[in-house]
């Protein structure tokens, strides 16, 4: 547990300087040029954050890759020597008439022994080459694994630090969802491009160069002829790289937009489901996915055509080379004394070099994707904001006096430059003075507070503190002098203790007693003490485990613990009940003494003791003075106060005594309930826990089954939906795999024909005919490989991209389907869920698309290769197959180890995603608390586990990958050894020499065909081994994906089941409702509540924060089901009703209204039930009813004005009015108002309240309100205390009762 966040330091993350991943972004930004403007960075820029150790690893990896690339074609030199060992063409013209048969038999034995000895020596050379290649492969895999993991962590941290650094103006143009999805997708793609795939690029390039170098050294003119088509191949490679990068960049931009939609909705599921907007958001997400699919399919087509063309040109070059090779052997070429072995070396080395180009598609694709992703990430990292919270520049005064002055301040929001918010504002606040800002919503009050914090800079004029322009002060010092409580308090997903401690100044360590004292001042200590875990209670995401009032009290305690010189209170008590408000208000007034305090409030009773009250109107101060002065003036302020007043006068002392009496009575009842709780609650709680656990297990009962055959499910999913593409791709993959084994048969036959030629003897007609036919066959194979490569790569890639897009759609849709309790669980926090949504489908490419095509191609190549080997020499094939299981075990061990390694890393990245989302979504709160370093360190701590795994897993994974190469090479060497041994064993030595050599050559030809087929099969298995790491990670991602897809929530918003009925009246009834949250089964929230709201009646729920009011509304919306009891709509149990039908009858306005990052009109239209059409005029009418039409129309773009991420571009009151309009456009039978007017100013509240009263006519309305003036006209008021209804009746009945409600009403309003 972190007792004091201010004690953490940035440097505490790294235990080893060798793994330091926290360079100073300022220094890096100065040292490195910014990326180019073409949507991708250069390779040099890609590695811009590499340190000394990283460059050592990069160089080591490149050396290893180059060694592996060079040594593989060099093995062809050994193959050529083997070929020359069997060359008997020089013996064809020898005269054997004078040699006895016994001597010829002796010659047979000598020839066989000589060949066997030579082969054995060459086999040893092959082993040596294999060892060298294996060392190179180990070095490549180890270095690039460690390098990519280190760089991935480093870039993640730099990107997160850059996000924490950016100012509010920048965030106004960027949705938080877009930014947070980048770290899950873009950084992973950068890491992927820096991984072993980058090493494979060097390996293939060096293999290409080495192959041609060997060719030139052995027979330069033959190599030159083969190279005649190289320019065409280079053009193809350039074409491939350019278009792959272009389409990748466009696709990734659309992916970021989709990520923003996902985060906005997943983070606000209550709003989405209450509006029944699951399908609409899913459709919007699907449109972004369709855009991605378009670009990725274009990329797939480019890759398929490009690689097919490369292989066609390669085959064409070999056909041309075969024809010219026959001339060289006959001495008619520029090079002389070229044997068949030399021609084979040239052919095989150039073939291997050219085939390496075919393998370049995957690393080029990964690299181009990484370069495009790096461009987007590095742009953010490079940006140094104008308001830089990390800057050490600026004045740091020795003390802060607290004199604030705004001189002719003009301000416009960056996203609305044509809309003036403040127009020449002049305001001076002296040390220790309390100034209240009042006025209509959107008039500039909260903007003024943001300018004092320097969240923004004014566009004209200046803001000064103690005579210093804020722009001249050190920003961190400035914000450390300020304590802020905002209108929508933000808590972080940690304990209550940590949340309060986050308010402490840098370098200060408040004691436990000081923290508790601040909680008491905020009237929070009592409710915290009643929580099972007390101050160690986790508050959930954005404080979701607490009520609005509880959150606000903790936020107040957080501000008080800072002991600030300046206190900013922006509607600090708006979410508090009357009882708490009075206590907290007194605490705030006490805390304000000696401090400069600025208060923004709509409840004017909270500002009457201010030294000065400033009345704002359209960005200007139209009245200012004390409360009494403004009341005497009888102008705007006077009218506002009158509208909030009641016509009763009370004795405040009596009220205080009554409140004290009720609190003591409540505590006494609680103490008396302890004995009963001890006797019965334990058994009850255990039963409830068991029941809730069983319900959760029922929802997830299919998950274990889904994980068993997840690989098969992905493949079948792909084939079922894209059967035509998959079928054609399957045929293409089988065909492409068959081409090279059959090509090798023709090639060996060609070599045998060439071995029979010599410069001294004219070739026979049959030999020339064979050479011509073989060249034609090779050219036909080239055409075949072009078609089949396009089919298996282009079509499988297209099918794979479609599958990934489809799975993204299904996964997002499944996430929208989950009930609210799913998101209450720690393992399903928004950050984790959005990280999975961004990364898991991308990782699934390891078992789809291109990978499936490559696997089919490989298995086909292996199958045909083994079949051909058995056909030509079954003994050789059988002997080699006997050791093949070793290679199979290594291949699958590689996959298993990669899956094991990726699982904890994935979990760590998901956990870091929670921190990222939490900080970015609440960036203004983070920066106002100067807690950037706290969240940075928290993020760094999340990444410790993958960091530690780097050295643990690097050598193991590299060893297994390198072992794959070694075993493949050993199989080739063993093939030659066993093949020669078998030829030696089965040869008939009692023959004359010439027949013996013919028999020997026939056996050799068959063995050669069998061995080359086996070698191609072994090489294919080796290539399969390089794909296995991605397969392991993809299977893990597939499990996560299908876990969500298979989960059946108990409250299924997609369900078509359930009753519907006509003529809905809207009668709501609670029958003995008991409720516990599934994640907190030990805490009983509602304890047997019963009430009935008849058609057209209004029921008000009042009570202290956390007593269960908002929970009741959530039960009506059926976000949860009651633990016991029933909720009825018109006598129907809502569990039996169709969920969409139920929610379409309800309009809800919440305490903290959520708007989406779209236009005003689109936000209002979100309230329209599915299948209903509304006109713009109806939308305008709803806005007028909510008193929103005038301010919307006054905006430069009117109803088309974008409200920003979570409505950040408009004020709290404006947001709430738009939310009310959104509820009214539904024309609901049941209206749920949870503090619906809490953020409105007095004038707007009166108008909106009248509108709501009018809208409530004919509708059943459930109202939650702390402002009791808003519920005076309710048909029934229920006072909830500790989960039970303590009092009920009309306003007058409860006043006459002179009970708790009466006391609250008198305490709240007092006298005027």
UniProtKB/Swiss-Prot annotation:
Subcellular location: Membrane
Family matches, as SMART domains: AAA
Entry GO MF terms: ABC-type transporter activity; ATP binding; ATP hydrolysis activity; ATPase-coupled transmembrane transporter activity
Annotated transmembrane regions: 51-71, 127-147, 197-217, 224-244, 302-322, 344-364, 725-745, 776-796, 852-872, 874-894, 958-978
Pfam families: ABC_membrane, ABC_tran
Enzyme class: translocase
PROSITE patterns per record: ABC_TM1F, ABC_TRANSPORTER_1, ABC_TRANSPORTER_2
EC number in record: 7.6.2.2
Record's bilayer topology term: Multi-pass membrane protein
GO cellular component: membrane
Keyword terms of this UniProt record: ATP-binding, Glycoprotein, Membrane, Nucleotide-binding, Repeat, Translocase, Transmembrane, Transmembrane helix, Transport
Gene3D superfamilies per record: ABC transporter type 1, transmembrane domain, P-loop containing nucleotide triphosphate hydrolases
Ranges where the ABC transporter domain occurs: 404-643, 1068-1307
Binding site for ATP: 439-446, 1103-1110
Keyword Nucleotide-binding: yes
Glycosylation site positions: 98, 819
Catalysis: reaction(s): ATP + H2O + xenobioticSide 1 = ADP + phosphate + xenobioticSide 2
UniProt family annotation: Belongs to the ABC transporter superfamily. ABCB family. Multidrug resistance exporter (TC 3.A.1.201) subfamily.
Function, as annotated: Energy-dependent efflux pump responsible for decreased drug accumulation in multidrug resistance parasites.
Name by which UniProt lists this protein: Multidrug resistance protein 3
Source organism of this protein record: Entamoeba histolytica (strain ATCC 30459 / HM-1:IMSS / ABRM)
